[in-house]
């Protein structure tokens, strides 16, 4: 568990290094599926004050804190529910990075405009529906996960191929095989959101934004890096 704590700590520090967060915003978690335990950033603690020992450890099924003296992130129920729903997830990141959050606040899917997007995501990044007053007034953080899960299931999307979502009026969640990969995907998401924003400014005369990348080009760039026949890199 100490190695997972260190991994999740370093991933949280990467949020600061990559300028994805301000103040105490954002959080990263990681999971040990063999033990059914999750490590996550504590709630409201400044990144500069964090050390690996400060990160609480929770039971995946019950949400009970099994190790640590700090309260876990207020977004913990969202993380836990996503881990339960999507067994391929090994780490989750939540930020309020500016451009990705702008699309979330506008209630807009992030359209795949080019190959930078396609290198990392196999399609548009979905934005969830608005949450109902009952969902907001109930178990809000768990219901946040529910609208994410609903979005992927209703649209028949693979969380392994599209490792990100925009929560309407809120912000982005990203994930990956581990905590570090979930942060990498958060950084990529923010970059392609900025590219998309600027692309739409340049094509402002086109209704609903610019021209989406050709599907064939999107699939070529995604699957040359991912999947059984990937040939990008040294592995």
Question: What spans do the regions from the language model cover?
Answer:
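Glycine-rich flexible loops
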Residues: 1-235
């Amino acid at each position: 568990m100490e190695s997972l704590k260190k991994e999740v700590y370093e991933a949280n520090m990467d949020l600061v290094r990559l300028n994805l967060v301000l103040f105490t915003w954002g959080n990263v978690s990681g999971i040990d599926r063999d033990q059914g335990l999750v490590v996550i950033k504590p709630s409201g603690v400044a990144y500069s004050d964090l050390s690996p020992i400060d990160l609480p450890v929770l039971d995946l099924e019950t949400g009970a804190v099994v190790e640590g003296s700090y309260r876990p992130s207020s977004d913990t129920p969202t993380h836990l529910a996503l881990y339960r729903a999507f067994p391929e997830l090994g780490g989750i990141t939540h930020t309020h990075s500016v451009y990705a959050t702008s699309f979330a606040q506008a209630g807009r899917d992030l359209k795949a405009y080019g190959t930078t997007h396609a290198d990392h995501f196999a399609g548009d990044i979905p934005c969830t529906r608005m949450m109902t007053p009952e969902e907001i007034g109930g178990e809000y953080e768990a219901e946040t996960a529910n609208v994410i899960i609903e979005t992927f299931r209703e649209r028949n999307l693979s969380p392994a191929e599209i490792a990100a979502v925009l929560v309407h009026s809120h912000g982005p969640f990203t994930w990956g095989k581990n905590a570090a990969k979930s942060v990498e995907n958060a950084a990529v998401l923010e970059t392609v959101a900025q590219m998309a924003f600027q692309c739409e400014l340049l094509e402002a005369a086109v209704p609903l934004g610019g021209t989406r990348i050709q599907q064939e080009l999107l699939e070529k760039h995604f699957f040359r890096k991912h999947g059984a026949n990937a040939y990008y890199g040294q592995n």
